[in-house]
């Protein structure tokens, strides 16, 4: 036999050497359950687990339902802030229409102020203009070429802007309509 087999592990030596542990183990009666008691205990555990499962399932469904409601509310009211910024622009336009001023210069100044209000509302709504300068390189992600015209400019550069484009939070809402220079 080897040395390991002859010597018991230290834990076993301590338990065997301690007479109080042996007496305590001998004095406690072994709790023996009848099969009916074990079945009853297991059925109780099954009932508790089923109850916990149903509660967790209901909680998950409630969380999902609340998330769907929150998303619906977010979609419904997402434009509210932007709309609040447009109300003063509408007020200015109604005021301009209600005046009988025959002065074209004053009317133009009023329109310029209203345009500034509108651009301010766009900025607050994270909406920016796409207005390429003449000679800028054509960008198909932000520009839509309507025509290709002969020009002294480099090929595929903007010759004119027919309609400004817009982005909302770096997403193109409408590309700028441009004419581009034709290749030579």
From Swiss-Prot:
Q: Superkingdom, according to UniProt?
A: Bacteria
Q: Where in the cell is it found?
A: Cytoplasm
Example GO molecular function term? unfolded protein binding
Question: Keyword Cytoplasm on this protein?
Answer: yes
Q: Where is this region: Disordered?
A: 1-35
Q: Does the keyword Glycosyltransferase apply?
A: no
- Listed PROSITE patterns: GRPE
Q: Which keywords accompany this UniProt record?
A: Chaperone, Cytoplasm, Stress response
Residues forming coiled coils: none
Please cite one Gene Ontology biological process associated with this protein. Answer: protein folding
Q: Which InterPro entries match?
A: GrpE (IPR000740), GrpE_coiled_coil (IPR013805), GrpE_head (IPR009012)
The family database entries (CDD domains) matched by this protein are listed as: GrpE
Quaternary assembly: Homodimer.
Concerning its family, UniProt says:
Belongs to the GrpE family.
The protein's role, per its UniProt record: Participates actively in the response to hyperosmotic and heat shock by preventing the aggregation of stress-denatured proteins, in association with DnaK and GrpE. It is the nucleotide exchange factor for DnaK and may function as a thermosensor. Unfolded proteins bind initially to DnaJ; upon interaction with the DnaJ-bound protein, DnaK hydrolyzes its bound ATP, resulting in the formation of a stable complex. GrpE releases ADP from DnaK; ATP binding to DnaK triggers the release of the substrate protein, thus completing the reaction cycle.
Its recorded name reads Protein GrpE
Natural source organism: Polynucleobacter asymbioticus (strain DSM 18221 / CIP 109841 / QLW-P1DMWA-1) (Polynucleobacter necessarius subsp. asymbioticus)
């Amino acid at each position: 036999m080897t040395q390991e087999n002859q010597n018991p592990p230290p834990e076993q030596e301590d338990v065997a050497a301690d007479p109080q542990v042996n007496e305590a183990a001998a004095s406690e009666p072994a709790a023996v359950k009848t099969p009916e008691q074990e079945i009853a205990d297991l059925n109780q555990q099954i009932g508790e687990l089923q109850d916990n499962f149903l509660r967790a399932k209901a909680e998950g469904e409630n969380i999902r339902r609340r998330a769907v409601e929150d998303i619906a509310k977010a979609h419904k009211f997402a434009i509210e802030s932007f709309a609040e910024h447009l109300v003063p622009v509408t007020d200015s336009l109604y005021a301009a229409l209600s005046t009988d001023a025959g002065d074209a210069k004053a009317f133009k100044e009023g329109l310029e102020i209203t345009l500034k209000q509108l651009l301010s509302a766009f900025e607050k709504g994270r909406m920016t203009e796409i207005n390429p300068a003449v000679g800028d390189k054509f960008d198909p992600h932000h520009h839509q070429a309507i025509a290709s015209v002969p020009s002294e400019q480099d090929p595929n550069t903007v010759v004119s802007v027919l309609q400004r484009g817009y982005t909302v939070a770096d997403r193109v809402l409408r590309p700028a309509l441009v004419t581009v220079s034709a290749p030579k």
